[in-house]
Regions:
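Charged, compositionally biased, marginally structured helical/coil segments
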Residues: 1-147
Length: 147
């Protein structure tokens, strides 16, 4: 079952349950995925679907932070509610320990000793953590390890 089919099923359930917040969040996700399909003029692959979800996740986080900074807690809460719905369809995020293990093994594998090797380490780590860790968190961890 594709992600779009799962989202459509969840949307039907949310409509039956009259869960307006969940329904709206699912509609936004479906709209983003369908927009990406139309842009590419073909069905999305799993990794492309994941990229769309990650992009939407990042947008929700940034919007919630901006609303909080602007003193608009109600809109920030709405964005965070959408983020919780979106998280249900994303792969489980790596915890700090697992991410550190992956980074440490990549540093050892590449033979990195300084910040000059940052790009090579990131190139080794990112395919392993794709969709399961935020790139900025990975980047920060690699910088700390190489410093």
């Amino acid at each position: 079952m594709s992600l779009i089919e799962r989202l459509e099923g969840e949307l039907r359930e949310a409509m039956r349950a009259r869960d307006d917040d969940r329904r709206d969040a699912l509609r936004l996700l479906l709209s983003s995925l369908r927009g990406a399909e139309k842009e590419l003029q073909r069905p999305l692959h799993d990794d492309e679907e994941l990229q769309v979800l990650q992009r939407e996740r990042k947008r929700r986080i940034e919007a919630a932070e901006a609303f909080r900074a602007g003193g608009r807690a109600e809109q920030a809460d709405a964005e965070e509610a959408e983020l919780r719905v979106l998280a249900e369809f994303m792969p489980e995020q790596l915890d700090e320990e697992e991410l550190e293990e992956i980074v440490d093994s990549a540093i050892a594998e590449v033979g990195a000793t300084s910040m000059r090797d940052f790009g090579r380490v990131m190139a080794d780590v990112m395919p392993q953590v794709s969709g399961r860790a935020d790139g900025s968190v990975v980047s920060q961890l690699v910088r700390e390890k190489l410093a």
